[in-house]
Amino acid sequence: MTKLIFMGTPAFSATVLRGLLADGNYNILAVVTQPDRAVGRKKVIQMTPVKEVALEYNLPVYQPEKLSGSQEMDELMNLGADGIVTAAFGQFLPTKLLNSVDFAVNVHASLLPKYRGGAPIHYALINGDERAGVTIMEMVKEMDAGDMISSDSIAIEESDNVGTLFEKLAVVGRDLLLQTLPAYIAGDLKPVAQNPEQVTFSPNIQPEEEVLDWNKTARQLFNQIRGMYPWPVAHTYWQGERFKIQEAVEAEGEGSVGRVIARSKKELIIATGQGALSLKTVQPAGKPKMTIADFLNGAGRDIAVGDQFGDQ
């Protein structure tokens, strides 16, 4: 039985970990995940999804703030693991740790060399890609730069957002890893180097990137909104305050950019640089997320055709 150290943090990683545990060919010696964090307005301390799985299976859990130079890393190196599997861990692995095992592989949610970095699923949606995928790759010191062992992809559906694609690709990654790992460990798969000329990056979304520019086309804004939902959530401004938009669809119509061109009890359509957007789920400042109908019957009851969105 192959002895592994597993490293990961979000639900994507938890799906991969459950797959390894159910497979029966792997002995998970330890699980490494990010420290518990305070989340939400009430700052409730919350463990990571990977930690929840680890505790469910009574696995040893390590949560170093920084792995490099930590006591936890020394302990991990002394476990006698054959290899390391990572999936959206969130930290760089020191070369010293990588060199202490026979192999180290990463489950990365993109079709490398496209979208190295921490937000590949977001960028696949924001850029309007037709497909998204997962690559199993060897771990090296440079971020997501290792040789590629295997990859698989799925079509991006019109209804997908970051949350749905995250869940789908977690299953793709789990299955691909379980199919790939035995042959890789046996030496029957030869990894392929990434083409440096095709490398692109997907750094974590910055706050200024969350703002909707109504001069863009309706299609671009549609992709931005779904490419940031359920996190970090795209926003515009209404009456000078932040106005989050969780869901919208393309609509017919033209008009002055950012202005309301149609309004009913259940519909609010805003003109863009090309075409229009019909808002479906929104969150005004200081309010919970709500349907556009609830907004128009409440805080937005006075909105009229010609009103402007986007001005701070």
From Swiss-Prot:
Cited Pfam families: Formyl_trans_C, Formyl_trans_N
The protein's Enzyme Commission number: 2.1.2.9
Top-level EC class as recorded in UniProt: transferase
Domain of life: Bacteria
Claim: DNA-binding is one of the keywords in the record: no
GO cellular component terms given for this protein: cytosol
InterPro entries linked to this entry: Fmt (IPR005794), Formyl_trans_C (IPR005793), Formyl_trans_C_sf (IPR037022), Formyl_transf_N (IPR002376), Formyl_transf_N_sf (IPR036477), Formyl_transferase-like_C_sf (IPR011034), GART_AS (IPR001555), Met-tRNA-FMT_C (IPR044135)
Binding site for (6S)-5,6,7,8-tetrahydrofolate: 110-113
Reaction(s) this enzyme catalyzes, per UniProt: L-methionyl-tRNA(fMet) + (6R)-10-formyltetrahydrofolate = N-formyl-L-methionyl-tRNA(fMet) + (6S)-5,6,7,8-tetrahydrofolate + H(+)
Keywords: Protein biosynthesis, Transferase
GO function term, MF aspect, one: methionyl-tRNA formyltransferase activity
Biological role stated in the UniProt entry: Attaches a formyl group to the free amino group of methionyl-tRNA(fMet). The formyl group appears to play a dual role in the initiator identity of N-formylmethionyl-tRNA by promoting its recognition by IF2 and preventing the misappropriation of this tRNA by the elongation apparatus.
Family: Belongs to the Fmt family.
Name of the protein this chain belongs to: Methionyl-tRNA formyltransferase
